[in-house]
Structures are given as structure tokens and as C-alpha cells.
A protein has these predicted regions:
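Beta-strand segments within the central parallel beta-sheet cores of soluble alpha/beta enzyme folds
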Residues: 55-56, 152-160, 186, 247, ...
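Acidic/His- and Gly-rich active-site-bordering loop/insert found
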Residues: 2-124, 143-151
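Metal-dependent amide/peptide-bond hydrolase catalytic core
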Residues: 1-4, 65, 190, 195-197, ...
Length: 412
């Protein structure tokens, strides 16, 4: 059975590479998040593989609340018999390409690199690659079943479109609507580690309000920018203490704090009356998000209080919970670990990552979940969220084989 699955992946790998290239060629930047056209293209491609696709358009009000334009989640189900339901989740939305590319971001060019053929394009590693990984893993199981292999259970593909803005209208929406109730889940990842935990993330928008005045008479105003510089200095000073809080999870170090956006002011010759900035606070799995947010709000208020006449308003933009292992995750991890060792020739460890992902939405429902898919050892190797994002095609083939064999184990 192992041979038949591996043989199917090998024999159909040109089709799989072409399938991935066609997905990469259709932009799905988020922001702005107009992702329904990509879902339509993915539907046609999946149907071309003989798979039945359920499109689930997300209502426009929910899409707008997520800061997007359109989103259609796709579900593919194949029932082999009575048994567990295993969901495979990957996201098709991508961050905008930005500058500095040597290759066309939506060209899906393949280059013969020293380590073998490599495909370039936005989303090729995060995570349109796992649309291909999971679809062809399912096809490999279907082919094995036609040859007489008995499987018990159901495989579902959850192909969603809002991971880059939080996942609330992707996996979370599918689960809340009762469209799916899986027993296990595997979410998009890379090939050389099985991720079982990740950081949480809190985004806060802070508005600092003062009073405008003529720049020739600054004392008649209340300078919001001067206050903001002090507040930012206080935040940056707290980084040293955060660096001392070390997680016990392998692959995760300490909490971090970053200010990524700032805007404000009226004109060069006016005392600024309003500054808005957004901060990103990454939380290790051991932290309690509600406590982290409360402490930040107290810290911001105390820093602002040093500036008479300044008002501060704090709004939560995003709260992504940390991923902690759910009971039963080890069953998935062990099913992946053995074929990974056989295919890759190395032991694939379980680890944590400092990112946050859609996997947390499954864990929040008590569903055992790990991250595993096609990709290199690190995000840096893939240039994820960077120019010339890339994927070694050998990693795509390996991951497809490994996931298919893991599914065969879980459904046996």
C-alpha cells in the first residue's frame, strides 16, 4: 500500500506542479482581500481533478468586518467509510508581493537551483502549496481505495481565504456555521517539523489626542506627537523585560512587542493634535491573553498620564489565541513522523513556532491539530512574506507522499 501511494504521487507529480502553478498565477492579495475570484479558479482546478467542491460564500457583512472585500471558503469531502473525519486546512489568501522580486510574483516560474527545481511566486510556500499537497494526497488515497485498500473515515479539504487577516471568516466561520465537525485536523505547514504549538498575537490601535495650534506658538496647543514619542519610549523600554520571559515550548523563545504603523499630524506648520499607531504583541503559549491586554492598557494609560491634556483611546484590532496541544494531537504527529522519516531520511521533530495560524481555530473547539505540509526548514529559506518566495518542488512531492501515508494510517 505504501508503494502504491508513493507511486501515485510520483506518477502524477507533473500534474500537481501544474496545479500549483495555476493557483499561484491568480492573485489573491489580502489586503485588499478580494479573494472570491481565486476561490472560483481553485474550484475549477479541483473539479478538473475529479473532486467535488462545496463553495461557501461568506456573507458580505462578515467579510467587511474582517476588513476584506470577498471570501468564498471551499470544502471538499470524500467519505471512505465509517470512522473519523480528518480536515486538511490551507489558506489561499496571500500578503501583497511588495518590491525587490527577481521573478514575476504571479508567474510561477520554475528555476533549476542547486538543490533542484524551485518554483517562485507569492503564496507558493504560504500556503497555496498545501492546496496541492492536500488535494493530491486525497487523490492518492482514492486511487489506493480503487485498488482494494480499505479506509475508514472521511477526508475533508478546508481551503480558506482570510488567514492573513486573522481567520475569523475562514476556518472559524466554517466551524461556527456547523459546515464541518472534524475529529482531527492538519493545517498548512512545512515538511521538516510537525508544529504542535504557536504564539498568540494581540493587535491594539492606540489613538493619542491633544490640541492643534500654530507652530509659531506651540505652547498654545497640546502636542500629540510629543506625547506619543514618550509613550513609544515606554513601550520599547518594556522589551527587555519581555525578553526574560522564556517559553518552555521548543521553537518558541519569548514574547515580543512591535509598533508597525503610525500616522497623524495636519501640516508641517501645525502642532499635531492626533496620532494613531498600532502595536503587535506576540504571546507565548504560557501567557493568558486577557491578562496581557489588561496589562498593556494599564501601561499605555500610565505613560499617557505623564502628559497633561492628552487623551488616549485603545482599541483591540485582533486577538489570536496561542495554540497549545490538544489531547489526541500525538496520534496525528506519530502518523506523520514515521513516513516522514522514511521519505526524507531524517527524524522530523515536534516543535512550536513564534507565528500564529488558523490552526488555533480548530484547537479552540477541542479538535487535535498539528501543522504539516510542503516547505523547507524555515520561513527564511522560503522567503515567506518576502520577495522571491519559493518552494523546492522536491519538498512538495515529499510532503504529498507523507500526508497521504499519514492519512492512510489514521483511516486504517
Amino acid at each position: 500500500m505504501t508503494g502504491s501511494i508513493s507511486d501515485f504521487v510520483a506518477q502524477n507529480f507533473d500534474r500537481e506542479s501544474t496545479f500549483l502553478a495555476e493557483l499561484v498565477k491568480v492573485p489573491s492579495d489580502n489586503p485588499p482581500g478580494d479573494c472570491a475570484p481565486h476561490a472560483a479558479a481553485a474550484t475549477r482546478l479541483l473539479q478538473g481533478l475529479g473532486l467535488t467542491v462545496e463553495p461557501h460564500p461568506v456573507p458580505s457583512d462578515a467579510v467587511a468586518a474582517a476588513g476584506m472585500v470577498s471570501a468564498t471558503n471551499l470544502v471538499v469531502r470524500h467519505r471512505f467509510g465509517d470512522g473519523p473525519v480528518i480536515a486538511l486546512n490551507a489558506h489561499g489568501d496571500v500578503v501583497p508581493p511588495g518590491l525587490g522580486w527577481r521573478h514575476e510574483p504571479y508567474g510561477a516560474a520554475v528555476e533549476d537551483a542547486p538543490h533542484g527545481p524551485t518554483m517562485f511566486g507569492r503564496g507558493v510556500a504560504v500556503s497555496k502549496s498545501d492546496f496541492a499537497t492536500y488535494a493530491f494526497a486525497l487523490l492518492a488515497l482514492k486511487a489506493a481505495a480503487t485498488e482494494g485498500r480499505a479506509f475508514r473515515g472521511t477526508v475533508e479539504l478546508h481551503l480558506t481565504y482570510d488567514e492573513e487577516t486573522g481567520g475569523d471568516v475562514g476556518p472559524r466561520w466554517l466551524l461556527e456555521q456547523g459546515i464541518t465537525r472534524p475529529d482531527f485536523a492538519i493545517a498548512a505547514g512545512f515538511s521538516y517539523a510537525i508544529v504542535t504549538a504557536h504564539n498568540g498575537c494581540l493587535h491594539l490601535e492606540v489613538t493619542v489626542t491633544g490640541k492643534q495650534a500654530h507652530a509659531a506658538m506651540p505652547a498654545t496647543g497640546i502636542d500629540a506627537l510629543a506625547a506619543t514619542t514618550g509613550i513609544l519610549a515606554d513601550l520599547y523600554a518594556s522589551r527587555a523585560a519581555l525578553a526574560q520571559r522564556l517559553s518552555k515550548v521548543e521553537g518558541i523563545s519569548s514574547p515580543t512587542l512591535n509598533v508597525g504603523l503610525i500616522a497623524g499630524g495636519i501640516n508641517t506648520n501645525v502642532v499635531p493634535d492626533r496620532i494613531v499607531f498600532r502595536l503587535d504583541r506576540r504571546m507565548i503559549p504560557e501567557e493568558i491573553p486577557a491578562d496581557v491586554e489588561a496589562a498593556l492598557r494599564v501601561q499605555l494609560a500610565a505613560a499617557a498620564a505623564k502628559y497633561p491634556g492628552i487623551r488616549i483611546d485603545v482599541r483591540r484590532v485582533l486577538l489570536a489565541m496561542p495554540l497549545v496541544p490538544q489531547p489526541g494531537f500525538d496520534r496525528i504527529a506519530s502518523a506523520i513522523r514515521k513516513p516522514a522519516r522514511d521519505v526524507l531520511g531524517v527524524d522530523v521533530p515536534t516543535t512550536g513556532v513564534p507565528l500564529y495560524t488558523d490552526a488555533r481555530h480548530y484547537a479552540a473547539r477541542g479538535i487535535p491539530v498539528v501543522l504539516y505540509g510542503a516547505g523547507p526548514r524555515t520561513l527564511l529559506e522560503a522567503n515567506a512574506h518576502n520577495a522571491d518566495e519559493n518552494l523546492r518542488l522536491s519538498d512538495l512531492r515529499a510532503a504529498t507522499t507523507i500526508v497521504a501515508l499519514a492519512l492512510a494510517d489514521l483511516l486504517s
